[in-house]
Amino acid sequence: MADPSSYRPAPGTIPESPGVYRFRDGTGRVIYVGKARNLRNRLNSYFADPVNLHQRTRQMVFTAESVDWISVATEVEALQQEFTEIKQYDPRFNVRYRDDKSYPYLAVTVSEEFPRLQVMRGAKRKGVRYFGPYSHAWAIRETLDLLLRVFPARTCSSGVFKRAGQVGRPCLLGYIDKCAAPCVGSVSAEEHRAIVEGFCDFMAGRTDLMVRRLEREMADASAELEFERAARLRDDLAALRRAMEKQTVVFGDGTDADVVAFADDPLEAAVQVFHVRDGRIRGQRGWVVEKTEELTIGDLVHHFCTQVYGGEQGEADVPRELLVPELPADVEALADWLSDHRGSRVTLRVPQRGDKRALLETVARNATDALARHKLKRAGDLTTRSKALDEIAETLGLQTAPLRIECYDISQIQGTDVVASMVVFEDGLPRKSEYRRFIIRGATDDLSAMSEVLRRRFARYLDARAETGEAGVESAGDPATPAGPASTGPGVPDEPRVGTLVDPTTGRPRKFAYPPQLVVVDGGAPQVAAAAQALAELGVDDVALCGLAKRLEEVWLPDDDFPAILPRTSEGLYLLQRVRDEAHRFAITFHRQRRSRRMTESALDRVPGLGEVRRKALLRHFGSLKRLSAASVEEITEVPGVGQRTAEAILAALGDSTQPDEPRT
């Protein structure tokens, strides 16, 4: 670890303006991004007494080897810059409110002629009205199933809608009166839109008018002795009331707010948020995050707002009001920033009494319970993972536990569509952003394919090491131009030496930049021998290697005549099996994709610059590929949009496709 005093900037070079600062590790990778009202005061606080900092902050300061900053004019600009850089660099020491998924919304495609009701995730689209977010997609489908009795709107995809119109029969929902069947003309576009507007009014909280109208119609039907219709209206009312029960009314004034509460200890914090729309609780979400420094509840509110409401995904739905337990120090700048994202004024406040205070206390109890459950589960997970890694290290004779494990697998069918996968586990958990897929072109069997993929992976790693100037390392490929000296200037911090392990534009590691402590191959002694030979040819002797054979689950080591046997109940074996199975899943999925693509493509797909429209025009004109291949250049150019050069390329591609297949190199 670096001594913080070795890279501490001179206080006089740090401006006293607002800005954003970045700590980087030895490779130039951004590991922490922070915002400050006064850059000089904030940065000096890290170096004044680093030993007594918060545990995670101390680890960050001693891991870093450089710090740089950007000064801006206002706090709002600093807030925006901080958010942008956290999204760009994904620093490991920043508080991160995320759970690797986007939350579902109930979406209404109001811009279509026949609007559709559906579950939708991800980025919001124009012409779509959203209700939510919900915690689970099944909650949306359950609500829809109840409301389609009363509002029989379309829920099918465009393909299903068109096919039903072509055959003249609606889908099952049309027969059971849960769809008005606009696909077959049972209702007009105007009538269907009226149904959808009624649904939107109900979801927006205007429920009393709908209930009173149905009650009145039911009474009228009963008075006119239309008992079947009255019974249907009675069932519709019951469905509406069940749907209303799922969305508890907490505020009678139609409040549009997110209620946020926290529970924390010195190392972690749990956050819970209830989404209240039109006075009703629409959804609930929660996270548990690591605290990277001594953070107040106000600081946690700041981080929550910038990360949860700043994104382009569906979760970035900024409410009119945020009810929080404590206001952050930059509350005015934060409110301005949120208002810019929403497009109208957003307020943050601490409720003091009444229903809003009671709901905030309820959310706080949920946060406390969530933190307790997380700590109990995390204690078990950490113990299990540590035990598994220690068992693997002991079995393989490693000095330290393998914190980064890479596993490779080959997938093919009789030498066709040969592909390989590389999956990465760090600290016993999958790191999917590091997964890689390989197309194997020069090998047709598993052993040669395994050799090729390992040579390609570690050649890239050796090239990166050589370019950073590590002693004793020669490039495995073409020599790269060495990095030039960093530029400096008065009042500007020295730029960190960003080696080629890190992309200087993104601050993230390049592909294959970091070596594993352990390589696992899917297979037994032959696969391990092939992998060991490939590593030896490259001169890689500091990476452990093993293979996990199927069926007996034996662990094979290079040059060993007999496998190592881990107990069937061993945590180490469970981890190796999980790594191996993940590599197999990743490889076979890629293989199926390529095989499916190959089986459905034609020779015309390989013609450069020939798009789908012109391909269809050619097939319509000639009727088949056989007739097209027999045509002359002049005949092909008769097709609109096809010139002589393109016609020659088409004939060349069709001529190649009639030749026997040759192995690709």
Curated annotation (Swiss-Prot):
GO:BP terms for this protein?
Answer: nucleotide-excision repair; SOS response
* Major localization class: cytoplasm
The record ties this protein, via Gene3D superfamilies, to: 5' to 3' exonuclease, C-terminal subdomain, GIY-YIG endonuclease, UVR domain, UvrC, RNAse H endonuclease domain
Q: What is a single cellular component term in the Gene Ontology annotation?
A: cytoplasm
This chain belongs to the protein called UvrABC system protein C
Bias (Low complexity) ranges: 475-491
Alphabetized GO MF terms: DNA binding; excinuclease ABC activity
Which keywords describe this protein according to UniProt? Cytoplasm, DNA damage, DNA excision, DNA repair, Excision nuclease, SOS response
Domain GIY-YIG positions: 16-95
State the family named in the UniProt similarity comment for this chain: Belongs to the UvrC family.
Alphabetized Pfam families for the sequence: GIY-YIG, HHH_5, UVR, UvrC_RNaseH, UvrC_RNaseH_dom
Give the residue ranges for region: Disordered.
470-507
Where does the protein end up? Cytoplasm
